[in-house]
């Protein structure tokens, strides 16, 4: 399931340092020559494709990125130090476009690929550069050149790591809005979500995963009922399914266990492989259940549902239990990503030998 994640950033390479006007001052040497050094180059801005990243969420929290300016030249023929470069880590597949013209500037398609996206300004010349046979004591210098400045649009086609599964009005949209930057339409009636919504859950710096809120399922969805199998196919490429169940339906005649079993039947009818995909049970709306009855209700549900996998109890509205859930999801997603990476072939000629065991006397 692919969606487009985007972010806008302003980048500025460093300005070059100015040249220096200086003359040599030595004992017994009345007219020392020019010795003003050049200014240092401004820092460059690079972008590198990092295989460990899968979203652009970090760039929404830090939009402006500036490299350091080069230092000014000094006397005694000393050139100014160059400004420090900065490297922006981006997910593989990121497209960098000029936000003003729409021109595609770069595409990061290869893991580890590094491109120069803003060039630092060159340093200015010191007066040593202007010495000639007719001008023995030049007092000229030039300022440093400004670094490049750009407004960039970053685009990334992202694959959802986690798919939300459940009946209409189970609280999926509330959950995704509570843990991510997505803002789906939320209301107290079925089929509020008419299109898949994508949310990026930020666990920490350079730590995030993608979750998809799909339209709710009803019995017969595998044959196209309700919003149908159009959205069931979106779940096939996710790494984890969260089956969200409403523990406190408004209609007292509705049995949450029966609804949950109907969802599982639809999964199995549609695709056996989808049914076998890792699936966690998330019991939602605990804030609407009496605290004294929670444990008994949860125990009864799990027993009747006959679920053997991980079970989480949350309230998407109050965020109770959400923090633990998203950290556990992130750990699972990273493990799956690691297992999906191809094993590097090692030339047997260069395999290190195991250390020799010490000889026993």
Swiss-Prot record:
Binding sites annotated in the UniProt record for Mg(2+): 173, 193
Species of provenance: Polaromonas sp. (strain JS666 / ATCC BAA-500)
UniProt name for this protein: GTPase Obg
Keywords: Cytoplasm, GTP-binding, Hydrolase, Magnesium, Metal-binding, Nucleotide-binding
Biased composition (Pro residues): 351-361
Enzyme class: hydrolase
A GO molecular-function annotation: GTPase activity
Signal peptide start-end: none
Example of a GO biological process term: ribosome biogenesis
